[in-house]
Amino acid sequence: MYKRLVQEFFPKLDFENLEKYVNLIEFSNKNFNLTAFSGDILWKEGIFESIFTMNFIVGLVNNKENKKLKILDIGAGSGFPSIPFLITNPEIELTISESMQKRCQFLKDISEKLDLKFNLICKPVQEINPQKFDIITARAVANLEKLEKITKKIHFPKTLLAFIKGPKVFNEVQNCKNCNYKIIKVNNNINKKIFIAFKQVS
């Protein structure tokens, strides 16, 4: 069902490569326990949600010059949300920070087998050198207070911090003093409450 929904919503994507990516996750999951998603749920909450929400996040960026966007995905694990989005938008400049070695190795394999070009940093985000990213994002990594701390040294003015969250985001905002995140609900077709906590660094 959701595999078909992905095809319908994103007809211009490289669907063959996307299927290969899903198959690699399913195969590697047997040995590495990369994600709890499998089957139709993988297409729903892994693939569709990633592409849909990343499209939404990119829409929050003031990109009148239509420049190549530099995106950092923190703790992508098996590649969500950035890899499905990269497959559909190969023109972006993607960097992934992933500290778990087994997941990092999987991402290296993905890059080689699917011929995807992205920068992979196999260490915690706190240890990477500051770069001028347009967007810093993460999904299911940490609460807002922790994300605020670990990204503090790596962003620049005008960087958009945009984190994919569930309904508990409102509690996280209350607990993150002086963080000043805005919350927006992402209307979607998978009957799931998805929110983006975002702000532009001043």
Swiss-Prot record:
UniProt xrefs under PANTHER family: S-ADENOSYL-L-METHIONINE-DEPENDENT METHYLTRANSFERASES SUPERFAMILY PROTEIN (PTHR31760:SF0)
Keyword Transferase: yes
Pfam families named in the record: GidB (PF02527)
Compartments reported by the entry: Cytoplasm
Family: Belongs to the methyltransferase superfamily. RNA methyltransferase RsmG family.
InterPro entries: rRNA_ssu_MeTfrase_G, SAM-dependent_MTases_sf
Entry-linked Gene3D superfamilies: Vaccinia Virus protein VP39
Keyword Transferase: yes
Keywords, comma-separated and alphabetical: Cytoplasm, Methyltransferase, rRNA processing, S-adenosyl-L-methionine, Transferase
Annotated protein name in UniProt: Ribosomal RNA small subunit methyltransferase G
Binding site for S-adenosyl-L-methionine: G75, F80, V125, Q126, R139
GO cellular component: cytosol
GO molecular-function terms, A-Z: rRNA (guanine-N7-)-methyltransferase activity
Function: Specifically methylates the N7 position of a guanine in 16S rRNA.
Main subcellular localisation: cytoplasm
EC number(s) given by UniProt: 2.1.1.-
